[in-house]
């Protein structure tokens, strides 16, 4: 049998000639740099998965943002929501600091939300709605909050 004839090898996980480089996960920046220097095929992906918790669409949005080339600004609170927070706070004679302690947040967060600079967080908005007794999400922003559903 000459070297140039194809040979058939039977078995599990058989590699002829030692096979090629196996796929491996680089855990450090040094390993990534080493792979780049040696000219190996390289794919750098972030993993946004968690094991025992409910997945949130935030990871999908982060992946989408990572893959896009243009700059995407994060969402901000609408100015009408900020005005409603300010009006509701003043109706109850609360300072920003008082409202912040009532909802267990920092006064800077209340300030950011009132000025329209804050990044919307449903938990914080829910706490503010209950503390002020007005709607801050959905339609009819600024209207009194209805009682619990029966």
Curated annotation (Swiss-Prot):
CDD domains given in the database record: HTH_XRE
Gene Ontology annotations for the cellular component aspect, listed alphabetically: nucleus
GO molecular function: DNA binding
Keyword annotations: Activator, DNA-binding, Transcription, Transcription regulation
DNA-binding region: 96-115
Top-rank taxon: Eukaryota
InterPro entries: Cro/C1-type_HTH (IPR001387), Lambda_DNA-bd_dom_sf (IPR010982), MBF1_N (IPR013729)
Region entry Disordered, spans: 1-29
UniProt-listed SMART domains: HTH_XRE (SM00530)
Keyword Transferase: no
The HTH cro/C1-type domain, residue ranges: 85-139
Statement: the UniProt record of this protein carries the keyword Cell membrane: no
Function: Transcriptional coactivator that stimulates GCN4-dependent transcriptional activity by bridging the DNA-binding region of GCN4 and TBP (SPT15), thereby recruiting TBP to GCN4-bound promoters. Involved in induction of the ribosome quality control (RQC) pathway; a pathway that degrades nascent peptide chains during problematic translation. Required to prevent stalled ribosomes from frameshifting.
Family, per entry: Belongs to the MBF1 family.
Name of this chain's protein: Multiprotein-bridging factor 1
Organism: Kluyveromyces lactis (strain ATCC 8585 / CBS 2359 / DSM 70799 / NBRC 1267 / NRRL Y-1140 / WM37) (Yeast)
Organism classification: Eukaryota, Fungi, Dikarya, Ascomycota, Saccharomycotina
């Amino acid at each position: 049998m000459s070297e140039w004839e194809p040979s058939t090898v039977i078995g599990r996980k058989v590699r002829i000639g030692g096979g090629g480089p196996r796929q491996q996960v680089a855990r450090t920046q040094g390993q990534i740099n080493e792979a780049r220097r040696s000219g190996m095929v390289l794919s750098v992906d972030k993993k946004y998965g968690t094991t025992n918790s409910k997945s949130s669409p935030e990871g999908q949005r982060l992946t989408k943002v990572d893959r896009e080339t243009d700059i995407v600004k994060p969402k901000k609170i609408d100015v009408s929501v900020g005005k409603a927070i300010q009006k509701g706070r003043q109706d109850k004679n609360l300072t920003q600091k008082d409202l912040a302690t009532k909802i267990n947040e920092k006064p800077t967060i209340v300030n950011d939300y009132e000025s329209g600079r804050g990044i919307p967080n449903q938990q914080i908005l829910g706490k503010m709605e209950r503390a002020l007794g007005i709607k801050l999400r959905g339609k009819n922003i600024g209207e009194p909050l209805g009682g619990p559903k029966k």
